[in-house]
């Protein structure tokens, strides 16, 4: 068994988790926009959420900013790091050397499944910053999916310049852990 966050996985499953695989899965989304229309009730206006994906957001979504002891990740432009992950210049072994690697495993797992999470979303929530006081996340909406005994969360924020949404954070929690969406308004 192996513990990341507080989700316990078997070693066999952890060994399958790969930053390159997550990057390749994420890259597939570059040619797509996910559009959702949500309505709270019949007295409110519908809200359109259109999500776009690009290289620059992968870095934070994957948690690479947490790997403070991997110098190349800290120095290089985010887009360049993404390209080097894709072309194999930066291997999974490089990232696995980090003291903080275990802290990003749930993010990598979430990104590997992001397309399925968005296709099979369970619920969309309006993000309420006061619902999770210990969190520093700044987002507009939470997209939640539950599968295989795990809860996947993908948080999005609206871009001020073009009104499209982008990924702000993603992570996974076990069914026996507190649901991150408690205190947020569901649609």
Can you annotate each of these PLM segments?
Residues 1-144:
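An acidic, glycine-rich, mixed-charge low-complexity segment common to nucleic-acid enzymes
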Residues 110-187:
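Conserved binding-pocket/active-site segment within a compact domain
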